[in-house]
């Protein structure tokens, strides 16, 4: 939840400064030595793909995916990356006079080494890591040889976002808790207590707030696309090996091995290219449900032991630079009034992860009844009024004409509509026909409408669905507007203004790979059982929206911000393109909400 995640990250800095040191530690005996050559994975298990560039950022779990994971979990990750990135950034001495300037209604902000964190490329190929328990709790990290253990054990069948459990034949003491059952997950990690088959972002927030985890390479891996996973559960060691496992929708692959031993130590082994070519992932251990994370440079373990603490410890790797939204927001507010509800941010290079097109992060919420906790982290971003930031990413990713369809059923304006809409949507559960709490309206990441929900062509996904009779349905439109249910969550209409709705249960006769979390698609005919619901069914589970529509704003203030990379200047054509989008966005939003509200995108609104 946002409040929990924010508080967790606030504590990270304190952990790094004072809580992650134990001078009374006692080094335990080394774990049993590996007994194999570097990479014992059978050649037949390797993914049959050439090494090359990763898939287009518009691709992910479904073609046409627009955002990165559940925006409810983004806040903690953004705040953590701000703190961790400070050690990687090198800000210029002083601030130049052109660091921030307005070009018309676009705020141009120059990176001076203060808002963009350089890429942290994966550098553990042909290496081994040993995590040694500390007497005060947690783990220290040191280097060990890169040889994999020869006995791989049994091959297990894992699909995408899948998991298999195995008993541990000894009591493994992990962060002070005995573990005798391990879940080997397809995404390059082992969890204790529960499996992890979620499709949400493989980020630091999930590492911290999820289950206790040994993450040898925590990334979006898909064994069904290539490679094999092996598990050996023996008295001397529990070992899981990912042999040539493909990264989702990418030619990249991962060959890694994680082992843990009766004495409590953990070893992680990494192959070299071409067996290991993935770039975005996390190498770490975490006790789960923790408030602390110590980000470290694991490559330095070759020359020293890295002292950890009672919380998680590890490193996140990314091929691309990272835009620090916290630092950016603070820099923006140093030269602009605190009058904005949202910042809509564009960049002159790609800065989102490989599986991300654009995303939104909610930084404050005072609304009940929409599926979000009430919390306020706006102060972290240098504001009292900011509620949300949207990272649209590189302007070059978007067509010159904002109305041109280019991302599934989406055009640029509907993409903005979805990202802006994540401030309120889509998180609604309801009481179903059995009077049970249901999330059947929800699709991807439980933060978008289901493909099978008649969402009236909402920009928050789903489709407009025509009931053809006889249990047959057809999708007729998509990503055109905010439905009346959307507008209820946004505070623009009363509950009594929301008409009866329906979704289709147990759908059949679908095109291949079509599921609830699929991107909208017009012209799909399928069969199923119609289920009707009313807004009162939503309120029964979520509670009434507070404040009501009578007390909710009708004007949303947004600033369009263009971040220019260090040493570069803002290209006039790029600024003009962003302004063209900005001017088209205002009337699009007005139509999308049936003239019930407007966005104001001028800088210095109200003046």
What residue spans do the PLM features occupy?
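The catalytic-center signature of Zn2+-dependent metalloproteases
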Residues: 409-492
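C-terminal motif of bacterial Sec signal peptides marking the signal peptidase cleavage site
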Residues: 16-19
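Short linear, low-complexity motifs centered on an aromatic residue
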Residues: 253-257, 481, 495-528
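Intrinsically disordered, low-complexity proline-rich regions
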Residues: 27-35
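Zn2+-dependent metallopeptidase catalytic core
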Residues: 169, 178, 314-420, 515-606
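Bacterial N-terminal signal peptides that target proteins for export
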Residues: 1-9
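Extracytoplasmic Ser/Thr/Pro-rich, glycosylation-prone low-complexity segments
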Residues: 39-328, 485, 542-607
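Bacterial signal peptide processing site
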Residues: 21-23
């Amino acid at each position: 939840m946002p409040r929990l995640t924010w508080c967790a990250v606030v504590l990270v800095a304190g952990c790094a400064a004072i809580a992650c040191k134990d001078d009374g530690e006692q080094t335990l005996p080394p774990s049993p030595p590996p007994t194999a050559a570097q990479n014992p994975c059978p050649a037949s298990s390797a993914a049959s793909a050439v090494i090359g560039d990763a898939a287009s950022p518009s691709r992910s779990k479904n073609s046409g995916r627009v955002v990165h994971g559940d925006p409810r979990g983004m806040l903690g990750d953004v705040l953590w990356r701000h703190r961790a990135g400070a050690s990687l950034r090198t800000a210029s001495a002083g601030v130049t006079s052109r660091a921030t300037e307005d070009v018309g209604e676009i705020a141009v902000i120059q990176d001076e080494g203060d808002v963009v964190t350089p890429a942290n490329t994966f550098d553990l190929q042909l290496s081994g890591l040993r995590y040694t328990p500390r007497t005060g709790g947690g783990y220290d990290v040191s280097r060990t040889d890169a040889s994999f253990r020869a006995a791989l054990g049994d091959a297990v069948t894992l699909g995408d976002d899948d998991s298999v459990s195995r008993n541990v034949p000894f009591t493994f003491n992990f962060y002070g808790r005995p573990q005798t059952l391990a879940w080997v997950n397809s995404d390059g990690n082992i969890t204790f207590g529960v499996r992890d088959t979620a499709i949400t972002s493989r980020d630091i927030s999930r590492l911290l707030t999820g289950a206790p985890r040994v993450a040898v390479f925590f990334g979006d891996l898909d064994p069904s696309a290539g490679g094999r996973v092996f598990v050996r559960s023996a008295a001397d060691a529990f070992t899981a090996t990912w042999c040539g496992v493909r990264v989702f929708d990418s030619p990249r692959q991962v060959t890694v091995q994680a082992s843990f031993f009766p004495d409590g130590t953990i070893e992680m082994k990494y192959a070299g290219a071409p067996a290991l070519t993935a770039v975005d992932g996390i190498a770490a251990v975490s006790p789960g449900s923790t408030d602390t994370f110590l980000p470290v440079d694991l490559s330095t373990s070759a020359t020293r032991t890295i002292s950890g603490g009672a919380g998680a410890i590890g490193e996140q790797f990314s091929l691309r630079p990272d835009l620090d939204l916290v630092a950016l927001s603070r820099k923006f507010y140093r030269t602009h009034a605190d009058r904005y509800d949202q910042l809509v941010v564009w960049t002159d290079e790609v800065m989102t992860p490989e599986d991300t097109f654009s995303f939104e992060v909610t930084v404050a919420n005072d609304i009940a009844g929409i599926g979000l906790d009430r919390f306020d982290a706006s102060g972290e971003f240098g504001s009292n009024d900011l509620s949300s930031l949207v990272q649209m990413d590189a302007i070059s990713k978007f067509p010159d004409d904002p109305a041109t369809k280019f991302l599934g059923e989406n055009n640029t304006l509907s993409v903005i509509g979805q990202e802006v809409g994540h401030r309120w949507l889509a998180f609604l559960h309801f009481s179903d026909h059995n009077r049970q709490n249901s999330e059947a309206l929800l699709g991807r990441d439980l933060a978008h409408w289901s493909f099978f929900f008649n969402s009236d062509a909402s920009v928050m996904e789903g489709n407009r669905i025509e009931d053809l009779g006889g249990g047959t349905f057809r999708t007729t439109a998509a990503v055109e507007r905010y439905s009346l249910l959307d507008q209820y969550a946004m505070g623009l209409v009363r509950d009594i203004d929301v008409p009866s709705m329906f979704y289709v249960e147990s759908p059949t006769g679908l095109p291949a790979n079509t599921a609830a979390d699929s991107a909208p698609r017009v012209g799909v005919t399928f069969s199923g059982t119609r289920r009707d619901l009313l807004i009162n069914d939503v309120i029964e589970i979520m509670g009434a929206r507070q404040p009501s529509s009578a007390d909710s704003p009708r004007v949303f203030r947004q600033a369009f911000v263009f971040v220019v990379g260090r040493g570069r200047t803002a290209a006039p054509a790029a600024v003009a393109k962003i302004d063209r989008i900005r001017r088209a966005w205002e009337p699009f939003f007005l139509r999308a909400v049936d003239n019930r509200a407007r966005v104001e995108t001028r800088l210095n609104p109200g003046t």
